[in-house]
Amino acid sequence: MDVSELFFEIDDPGQEGKCLHLLSDILMIVLCGYLCDCEGFEEVYDYACDKEEVLREFLELPCGIPSHDTLNRVFRRLSPTQLESLLINWGKEIVGLLSQKQLIVDGKQLRGTVEAGHKQATVQILSVWAEKERLCLAQKQIANKTNEITAIPELLSTLDITDSIVSIDAIGCQKAITQLIVERQANYVIGLKSNQDGLYTQVADWFERHQSSLQAEISRDLEHGRAEKRTVILSEKLNFIDAAQEWVGLKSVIYVESSRWVNQEHQLSKRYYISSLAGYWAAQVGHFIRRHWGIENQQHWHLDVTFNEDGCQVRKDHAPRNLTTIRKLALGLISRHPAKISLKRKRKKAARDDEFLIELLNQLNI
């Protein structure tokens, strides 16, 4: 697909015959704006006006640059699922088969959508993320955190997860979710939560009594003034778990202890996991657990800090969801470019260097 044709297949929400601007032009202008360090529709409009000559090299712009009000109105009315399908199809094309790959499932609030008098963001997005390629493969808007329980199976069902390893935090510790993952011929590593039908207590108590007699994988890190010791213990012995057979595919339990010193203060955390993996070393499964937080560091953090997503005050209709899709597409393009500079500097470079912007966009050619 040529970059100039990227958005042609998305249905225009405007009335036929009354639209001054092409939808494909509008979407490409916003994508370019977010690649070039813009925040919000007004900054995107300012950027497009300054770079109109460059944009005309690959856009039609029959009536010039659309106003920021037009950009906002289109994004409010645009079908989120169609725009998301473009992001997802691009990601799938790059990632290819998911066999033996780690897929991370996690949710994120768009904190800028918190309305006056409320504590909860009105928009929360659940994502499936390819850990190695650092790309979003699927996403779904949910009403609140508890809705992840029903949304996770729906989201995973959109992908061929055969032979992949799905990691989820404790919200995914549900029998229906483990069953679906195994039925789809994949494996899981899922965090345990303390209110999960006594399972947490049984696993925690068992490791407390037996960890001294089990082989442990110990690693140490020292960075940014923080010393950390990580201990991972894996056991395939499950006869101490009541109704273990109800957890489809359950083959192992894992204990992870993190002991660290931060500014001369000692911090200790203990976490427990269930998994369908068998025949793995503790170090291997510990690696999957640690990499699970890659979605926080490589996607959520950059959306918030590099793209200031939480500071975005766009709240109405479909605009917040559509903008997060554009941000993820921009993040994927910037992250995959081989330039050895920070993502923040890449955005600023794209704003200054038109050839660099074209290099980023050319990654969409699939």
Feature-to-residue mapping (PLM):
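Short coil/turn segments at secondary-structure boundaries
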Residues: 86-89, 215-221, 299-305, 341-345
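Polybasic low-complexity intrinsically disordered regions
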Residues: 93-167, 173-186, 193
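Membrane-interface transmembrane-helix boundary segments in multi-pass integral membrane proteins
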Residues: 316-327
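Dynamic "connector" segments at or just before major functional cores
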Residues: 1-105, 112-113, 127-139, 153, ...
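An anionic, glycine-rich sequence signature occurring as long contiguous blocks
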Residues: 193-291
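A residue-level signal for conserved active-site and pocket-lining positions in enzyme catalytic cores
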Residues: 29, 106, 134, 188, ...
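Short amphipathic alpha-helical "interface-anchor" segments enriched in bulky aromatics
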Residues: 44, 280-313
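Generic secondary-structure signature for well-ordered alpha-helical cores
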Residues: 80, 157, 208, 212, ...
